[in-house]
């Protein structure tokens, strides 16, 4: 990322605060090529490819400007027009350039703020994935109600471009960006389908992720302001906040107006115990207070998405549930709060009392059905969870095959060690072990029994022990109480930077 600063400083010397000239810089597409190559460990470095050259980009942009995008028919075939047969290929080139160019100024702002130790106050509550797990354990047992919310999707890309315009002032750049988005999939209509959004996100992941993150950041900035000022808000006054262009300029004035008009205390509308957690496109809203306040926030969310982001969201899509009666899914786990009831006998003099004690315990369970569905999609088992042999390359060695299965098994064990019940995790590990054995037996054109007899089943299966299991098995006997206690306890590892790939298929 350090080279970004050099390139932007070079461009700033020519034109202040403009991103459009960077689109026509050769080094931008050199960075795009380097980024694409570094994402995969299976690709060989064949040098700087001609497809990322500046000459190709200029030709594509020239053809885009020559098209009359105002009369594009919604029934035009994607194979027609200026894209020709290389539509996806050409769009990826420009998309990578757009993504890198728009990332540069925001990365520089972030790096400068970190160097000066200036953390933006409005984002002081932003945490990494590490904080979500202890949050569930420490806070959720004291809460009563929860809303499992999926951020509305899809959203029209024009809204995403408008959000970006509030932060970057460069009309030619956004004109070219709109032209690219309209030409890509005929997004000049009023309705954006999930299929078109999915196609764009897969073929242009970096640009789509950047635009989508901006959308989430914008919605959360408004939500945090509403949360901080919730004691002065009423639902009928919510539309005042939806003029986003002058939002920051009006914010202080609005606070003064609310303090003047609603000077009497409104403790009934305050909700200091509300908690908000988000990861990717899903968020959890939990509270200890009465459902009325949760219902208020539910309508805030719906009006925000409908009035400001033009995303239709119906009230019935957001349900308010009691934690003791509802399980919610987050980060690949099924979580709920279980009530443990116990009766204690108390005696005072000659009188005996029975006291019922209710304690709450957080249950975090590995979702077996979504994981089996993901393993079946990856050809490790069938839809019923029966292990099958996975097709491999003929020149793959036994060591490479075993190492590939071991990596997947250890990653899953590492990620799901925080579960309170590991029975489902052991089943997933069993599927991977047996699938590995069947794959090796199929490669050697042998049966599973004959292959295990020849290679030694015990040594092969012990390869699937995680590093923690290997260390503890050397310290404690296999049947010791300490080792069994280790298997039962939840352990969160701090080196988890993102959710497992199989979790993203949920």
Curated annotation (Swiss-Prot):
Residues passing through the membrane, by range: none
Keywords carried by this UniProt record: Chloroplast, mRNA processing, Plastid, RNA-binding, tRNA processing
Cellular location(s): Plastid, Chloroplast
Pfam family name, one: MatK_N
Domain of life of the source: Eukaryota
GO CC annotation, single: chloroplast
BP term (GO), one: RNA splicing
The protein's name in its UniProt record: Maturase K
Upper classification of the organism: Eukaryota, Viridiplantae, Streptophyta, Embryophyta, Tracheophyta
Gene (name only): matK
């Amino acid at each position: 990322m350090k080279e970004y600063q050099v390139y932007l400083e070079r461009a700033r010397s020519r034109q202040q605060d403009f991103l459009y000239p960077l689109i026509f810089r050769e080094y931008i597409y050199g960075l795009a090529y380097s980024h694409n190559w570094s994402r995969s460990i299976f690709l060989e470095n064949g040098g700087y490819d001609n497809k990322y050259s500046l000459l190709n980009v200029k030709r594509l942009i020239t053809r885009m400007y020559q098209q009359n995008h105002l009369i594009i028919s919604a029934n035009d075939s994607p194979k027609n027009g200026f894209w020709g047969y290389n539509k996806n290929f050409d769009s990826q080139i420009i998309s990578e350039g757009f993504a890198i160019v728009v990332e540069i100024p925001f990365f520089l702002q972030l790096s400068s703020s970190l160097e000066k130790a200036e953390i933006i106050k409005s984002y002081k509550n932003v945490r990494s994935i590490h904080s979500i797990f202890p949050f569930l354990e420490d806070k959720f047992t004291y809460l009563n109600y929860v809303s499992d919310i999926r951020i509305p999707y899809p959203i029209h890309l024009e809204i995403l471009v408008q959000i970006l315009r509030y932060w970057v002032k460069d009309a030619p750049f956004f004109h070219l960006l709109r032209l690219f988005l309209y030409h890509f999939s005929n997004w000049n209509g009023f309705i954006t389908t999930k299929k078109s959004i999915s196609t764009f996100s897969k073929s242009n992941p970096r640009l789509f992720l950047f635009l989508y993150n901006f959308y989430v950041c914008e919605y959360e900035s408004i939500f945090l302001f509403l949360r901080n000022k919730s004691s002065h808000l009423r639902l009928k006054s919510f539309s005042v906040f939806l003029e986003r262009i002058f939002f920051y300029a009006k914010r202080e004035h609005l606070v003064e107006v609310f303090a003047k008009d609603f000077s009497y205390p409104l403790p009934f509308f305050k909700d200091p115990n509300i908690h908000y957690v988000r990861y990717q496109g899903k968020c959890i809203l939990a509270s200890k207070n009465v459902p009325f306040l949760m219902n208020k926030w539910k309508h805030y969310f719906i009006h925000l998405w409908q009035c400001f982001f033009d995303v239709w969201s119906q009230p019935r899509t957001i349900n308010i549930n009691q934690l003791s009666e509802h399980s919610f899914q987050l980060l690949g786990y099924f979580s709920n709060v279980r009530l443990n009831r116990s009766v204690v006998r108390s005696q005072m003099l000659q009188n005996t009392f029975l006291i019922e004690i209710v304690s709450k315990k957080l249950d975090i369970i590995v979702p077996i059905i979504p994981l089996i569905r993901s393993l079946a999609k990856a050809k490790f088992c069938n839809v019923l969870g029966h292990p099958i042999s996975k097709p491999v390359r003929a020149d793959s060695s036994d060591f490479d095959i075993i190492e590939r299965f071991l990596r997947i098994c250890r990653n899953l064990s590492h990620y799901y060690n925080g579960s309170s019940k590991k029975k489902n995790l052991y089943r997933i590990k069993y599927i991977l072990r047996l699938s590995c054995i069947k794959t090796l037996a199929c490669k050697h054109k042998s049966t599973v029994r004959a292959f295990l007899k020849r290679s030694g089943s015990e040594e092969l299966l012990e390869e699937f022990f995680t590093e923690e299991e290997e260390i503890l098995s050397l310290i404690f006997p296999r049947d010791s109480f300490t080792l069994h206690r280790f298997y039962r306890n939840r352990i969160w590892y701090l080196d988890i930077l993102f959710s497992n790939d199989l979790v993203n298929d949920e």
